């Protein structure tokens, strides 16, 4: 194996960050992502939920196509008006938005084009994170361990990401993690501590 890359969704001191870390055979370390939802978090649960909300309001405005999400999200939240939806989203923390990601999966499972595009964007973001770290490490061949909640439990994101990565970086192969996400997060924290990264 030429090296290994780990998409790690959780860091011990921060919640819901998409971060890819890798190390090559020479022991060099590279990281991509982990910037948080206010800066850049493509492929995260928050991003999927935010994009699902955007699809709904675009339909309501007449700027976007009809989407099943405009039925699923208000039904899940018990909101009947745009004002109630706004109050829900802005009345809590970001976990409220991230909690909507499974509805994007539900809509994608029914062939909803807006939801499928949300997954295309999310998988492209994850692929870009992996290939950026791999490029900095000079890795053309290696393994990518799929760690974290979404990649473990969201079939659509996992399938879209693995297919996108296979097309764009055929030498990087997705593998099941050798340990659980908590162990991966601990390893990531140690790697970052050794490298002096925040």
Residue ranges and their predicted role:
Residues 2-10, 53-198:
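ATP-binding/phosphotransfer module of carbohydrate and carboxylate kinases, centering on a glycine-rich
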Residues 1-67:
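Phosphate-binding/catalytic loop of phosphoryl-transfer enzymes
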């Amino acid at each position: 194996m030429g090296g290994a890359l780990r998409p790690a969704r959780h860091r011990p001191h921060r919640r819901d960050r998409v971060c890819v870390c890798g190390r090559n055979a020479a022991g060099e370390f590279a990281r991509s992502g982990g910037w948080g939802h206010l800066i850049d978090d493509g492929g995260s649960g928050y991003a999927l939920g935010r994009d699902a909300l955007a699809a709904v309001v675009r339909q309501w405005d007449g700027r976007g196509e009809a989407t099943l999400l405009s039925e699923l999200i208000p039904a899940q939240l018990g909101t009947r008006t745009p004002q109630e939806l706004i109050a829900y989203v802005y009345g809590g923390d970001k976990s409220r938005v991230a909690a909507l990601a499974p509805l994007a999966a539900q809509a994608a499972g029914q062939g909803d084009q807006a939801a499928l595009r949300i997954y295309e964007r999310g998988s492209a973001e994850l692929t870009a994170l992996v290939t950026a770290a791999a490029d900095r490490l000079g890795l053309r061949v290696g393994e990518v361990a799929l760690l974290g909640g979404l990649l473990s439990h969201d079939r659509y994101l996992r399938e879209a990401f693995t297919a996108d990565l296979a097309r764009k970086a055929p030498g990087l192969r997705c593998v099941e993690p050798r340990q659980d996400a908590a162990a991966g997060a601990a390893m990531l924290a140690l790697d970052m501590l050794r490298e002096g990264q925040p």
